[in-house]
Amino acid sequence: MRAFLKILMVLIFMSVAYAKNPSTLSKEEEVLQHLQSFSAHFKQVLKNEKPLVYYGVLKAKAPNWALWVYEKPLKKEIYMNDKEVVIYEPNLFQATITPLKDKTDFFTILKRLKKQDDGSFKTTINKTTYRLVFKDGKPFSLEFKDGMNNLVTITFSQAEINPTIANEIFVFKPKDENIDIVRQ
């Protein structure tokens, strides 16, 4: 009986060790686990009565930096770090600086994702559910409902995993000294 219990304990230990073995992770889970930086072009669709479509470039770097540069239909830059969000709207000559109350930066979302049976990844942060879909081993689309219950779908193209990105690009530096800076 003792020998049986010892063998059983060894088998249980091995099964737990195997379950924790990183080699059992899917390719997508490996990408998320080792993601330190991300760069991609994006198409953002806000689905409401009249869908709005935006195009731009995202650059993000761990632990929590992100730069969203909207190019069409209006130019806008969004700088995020662990403390604040800066929204720069060059057409309005204005930058709005808001303290970041909730950890909803790009990397916090990615780190909390859990694989679903359909192969997508989901997480819920502050009553917002995020769903990420991979294509060809890279993040392809991110969906969530915004504060006004509109479905937002961001589709990534030309995605790069762990590119070299300089920290300086995540710091807002006014390009024009005549802009208004609004602190909220």
Curated annotation (Swiss-Prot):
Alphabetized CDD domains for the sequence: LolA
Domain of life: Bacteria
Signal peptide: 1-19
InterPro entries the record matches: LolA/LolB/LppX, OM_lipoprot_carrier_LolA-like, OM_lipoprot_carrier_LolA_Pbac
UniProt subcellular location: Periplasm
Gene Ontology cellular-component terms listed: periplasmic space
Predominant location category: periplasm
Alphabetical UniProt keywords: Chaperone, Periplasm, Protein transport, Signal, Transport
GO biological process: lipoprotein transport
Segments crossing the lipid bilayer: none
Subunit structure, as described in the record: Monomer.
Record family assignment: Belongs to the LolA family.
Role, per record: Participates in the translocation of lipoproteins from the inner membrane to the outer membrane. Only forms a complex with a lipoprotein if the residue after the N-terminal Cys is not an aspartate (The Asp acts as a targeting signal to indicate that the lipoprotein should stay in the inner membrane).
Protein's name in the database: Outer-membrane lipoprotein carrier protein
Lineage, highest ranks first: Bacteria, Pseudomonadati, Campylobacterota, Epsilonproteobacteria, Campylobacterales
